[in-house]
Each structure stands twice: as structure tokens, then as C-alpha cells.
Amino acid sequence: FPYTTLFRSKPIDAGFLRIKKGTTEFDPSYHWVISKQHLEGFSVSPKYIPACRYIGNGKVCAYVFVKESNQSIGHIDLACVPVMMDLKSKTMKRINIPVSSGYSVAIEKYKDKVLFGNMNEKDKGIYIYDPKTNTASGKAVITTEGQAWQMHYFGE
């Protein structure tokens, strides 16, 4: 269960809480504050989680908001970093997909891969990430005219 600082005038920490299977209350023994954690390659910590998808075995593919520079496309900030999170070890690592606009942060599991909607300086569309090999497509495998802000796989 992710919690975030999005749309708050007074920021709070962002991260994850847990509700154990068969219960209805938050587990007081588990919480992970991502807004105080260092993300390799960045000088500032993530502020919140604009999108995430649980992919099994304690792993989450997500976008985290890391506002480090004035990188933008026109008036649109590029500050959403694709990451793989490990809820068990409370670690996150950047995925080799470009930093995206917050308007294009769709994440969907597709068979044994993960699809990331992304809008960056070079292209707009859908990237493919393979969590087993930790590899990603070097560019959008499907390009879009608008932002890929939502996806749903109607399969197994």
C-alpha cells in the first residue's frame, strides 16, 4: 500500500505500509519511507510515487518523483524516474528507461515483462522492461502521439 505526498500543501514522507494477508489493519512492524532514501545517480531523494505496479515476490516497478534539475520539455518537467523496488530489503534501483514527464507514467505487467508509458526528450510511447534480466528497451517499442498515462493488459 503506497502512500504519497502528492496534492498536499504540507509535505509528508512517502513510502509503503503493509496489511498482512488475512488482516485489515496496518502492520506496525513494517513501513518503508522512500522519501528519505538515496537513489543512485541523483543528489536528492525521491519525493513521492506517482505510479507503481506490484509484480510479485516482493517487487514493485514504479516511477518516483526526483526533482533535481530544470530538465523539461517546454513547460513539462521531466522528473519521474523508473525504478525497481524490493519491498523485503527496502531498496530501489533505477531502471534503464529515460526520466519521464508526470503525464506519462503508466505501468502495466504484460506476461513476464513490465510496460512503462514514458514521455521524454526523445520520444513518447511504451518501453518494455524485463525484471528477470534487468534489461529495458533502448527506446519506445510503441510510439504514441499523446502521453501513455494508462494501460491495461486484458490477458492472464
List the model feature ranges, each with a label.
Residues 2-6:
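Short, small-residue-biased leader/transition segments that mark boundaries at the very start
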Residues 9-12, 144:
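Active-site-proximal structural scaffolding
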Residues 11-25, 76-89, 128-130:
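Beta-propeller blade signature
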Residues 11-71:
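C-terminal amphipathic alpha-helical segment
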Residues 22-47, 84, 88-101, 142-156:
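Surface-exposed loop and turn segments in beta-propeller and other repeat-based domains
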Residues 25, 69, 91, 123, ...:
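Flexible, glycine-rich phosphate/dinucleotide-binding loops
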Residues 44-119:
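Loop/turn-rich, solvent-exposed surfaces of beta-rich toroidal or solenoidal domains
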Residues 117-156:
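Hydrophobic, glycine-enriched assembly/anchoring segments
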